[in-house]
Amino acid sequence: MKTLLLTLVVVTIVCLDFGHTMICYNQQSSQPPTTTTCSEGQCYKQRWRDHRGWRTERGCGCPKAIPEVKLNCCKTDRCNG
């Protein structure tokens, strides 16, 4: 019985992951919203204008800022919508 209880506790801890992952949007520009699970603990959204108009890129992590690109990095689930 103790072994079963210990196994359940371990499985629960592994499944919960204690918040080390988060959910980020990862669709590009006008694509339908999609999400992914990120282990980096951050999401980003960057926007820039080109000959087609405003372009948007979303994903995990926080890339290095580039001139003329609006970059927003954040640390909560789905914060890069």
Curated annotation (Swiss-Prot):
Assigned keywords, A-Z: Acetylcholine receptor inhibiting toxin, Disulfide bond, Ion channel impairing toxin, Neurotoxin, Postsynaptic neurotoxin, Secreted, Signal, Toxin
MF GO annotations: acetylcholine receptor inhibitor activity; ion channel regulator activity; toxin activity
Protein name: Three-finger toxin MALT0057C
Membership in a protein family: Belongs to the three-finger toxin family. Short-chain subfamily. Type I alpha-neurotoxin sub-subfamily.
GO cellular component: extracellular region
Lineage: Eukaryota, Metazoa, Chordata, Craniata, Vertebrata
SUPFAM superfamilies named in the record: Snake toxin-like
Tissues in which the UniProt entry reports expression: Expressed by the venom gland.
Site entry (May be critical for toxicity), positions: 52, 55
InterPro entries, per database record: Snake_3FTx, Snake_toxin-like_sf, Snake_toxin_con_site, Toxin_cobra-type
